[in-house]
UniProtKB/Swiss-Prot annotation:
The lineage of its organism: Bacteria, Bacillati, Bacillota, Bacilli, Bacillales. Belongs to the RimP family. Required for maturation of 30S ribosomal subunits. Keywords: Cytoplasm, Ribosome biogenesis. InterPro entries: Ribosome_maturation_RimP (IPR003728), RimP_C (IPR028998), RimP_C_sf (IPR036847), RimP_N (IPR028989), RimP_N_sf (IPR035956). One of its GO terms (cellular component) is cytosol. SUPFAM superfamilies: YhbC-like, C-terminal domain, YhbC-like, N-terminal domain. The gene is rimP. GO terms for biological process: ribosomal small subunit assembly; translation. It comes from the Bacteria. It is found in: Cytoplasm. PANTHER family: RIBOSOME MATURATION FACTOR RIMP. Pfam families: DUF150_C, RimP_N. This is Ribosome maturation factor RimP.
Amino acid sequence: MSKITEQVETIIQPVLNDLNFELVEVEFTKEGKDHFLRVSIDKEGGVDLNDCALASEKISEVMDAEDPIQEMYYLDVASPGAERPIKKEKDFQNAITKPVFVSLYAPIEGSKEWLGILQSVDETNIVMEVKEKAKTKQIEIPRNKIAKARHAVMI
């Protein structure tokens, strides 16, 4: 996590708490010549366009007051969607029995990417049920080897 995203999280977390929204993720990226501050929010039952607009307005107010980002940027507040990132311990626990996609820093059993059903989670590992050809198997992945994890839509 970058210093900017850490600062932004610290600034906007109280605002989102007051609105009863969960802060899912903050990203600050440059695309071409433009900078984007992307904030993903959620709440019980999901967020709609009005929730995103309200959060955007309140985040904008506090960001303008605190001004932690020197560059001009576009603020984008959205729901995390069906392929929500899995980052926090709570996210991993909530994903048990659900389809997930995991990208690794280094290959395990010849692959850096795994798609399957999350079976269990502990402090050091996750266990996924994955399909390989026509067979189903369980694979144990050390959590410190996970670059990114997210919910997946399996068809």
